[in-house]
C-alpha cells in the first residue's frame, strides 16, 4: 500500500512541476530559429501560428510564415518559410514599441517583445555613439525582426517556462555584409550584447548569432551554461537559412521538468 501511495504521490508531483526550456545552439541561433523551435515546443499548427502573426496588427505580415519539415545532411527538423515584401523603413525604438502596444498580443508577450527591442536599442546606441531615442534600426527594424521577436515572445510566454537554460554561444571570425558595409564577425551589436555571456570558438566563418536572437535570449532571462539535471518531455530541432559545413547544424529545443 505504501508503494502504491508513493507512486500516486510521485505522479501528482510530476504533473504539478512547471516545465522549463533547454536550448542548445551548436551552430548558433537566429530569430527565425527561435520562432521555429518555440512553435514546435508549443505545439501550434500553421493556422494557429498565422493567428499569432495577425495579432501583431501589421498588414504586410499577413500569411507570411509557415513552419515546414526540413533536413540538413539527412537529419530532419523544421524551418520557418518566411515571405515578406522588401522594405526600406528605418524604424526608431518608439515606432516599434507603438506597433507592439497597438497589437493584440497578450500583455506578457508585449512586455517580452519590448524588453528585447530595448536591449537591442541600447546596443545600437552604444555602437553608433548616440542616444537610444536617436537609434534608427536597419535590418533589425525590418518586418522580419518584428515578426521573429513578437511571435517568439508570444510562443515563449504561452509555454511560460519556470526556467530557460541555453548553451554557451558559438563564435567565429569572418565577414558579414549589411547596410553598414562589411563588418567583422561577431557584428558590433552582438559584440556589445555579449558582455557576461559565455562563448566558445568554432571552426567556421560568418555570423553564428544574430542581434535579434541574442537580444531575445537576454530579454527572456536565459541562463547560459551546461545542461541542467532534468527530465525531457518534448524536443524539436530548428534550422535556419545558413548551413555550416564544419558544424553540426540546427538548434535543439527541449521542454523539460526539473
Model-assigned labels for residue ranges:
Residues 15-20, 127-138, 172, 195-201:
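Glycine/charged-rich beta-loop-alpha catalytic/anionic-binding loops adjacent to active sites
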Residues 23, 109, 135-139, 165-168, ...:
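General beta-strand structural signal in soluble alpha/beta enzymes
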Residues 21-36, 137-159:
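Conserved phosphate/anionic-ligand binding catalytic regions in large, soluble enzymes, centered on
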Residues 9-15:
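Short, Lys/Arg-enriched N-terminal segments with co-localized hydrophobic residues
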Residues 44, 161-257:
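Mobile "lid/hinge" segments at catalytic clefts and subdomain interfaces of large enzymes
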Residues 40-128, 187-200, 204-207, 211-214, ...:
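Glycine-rich nucleotide/cofactor/substrate-binding loop typically near the N-terminus or early
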Residues 34-39, 149-156, 190, 213-220:
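Buried hydrophobic packing segments
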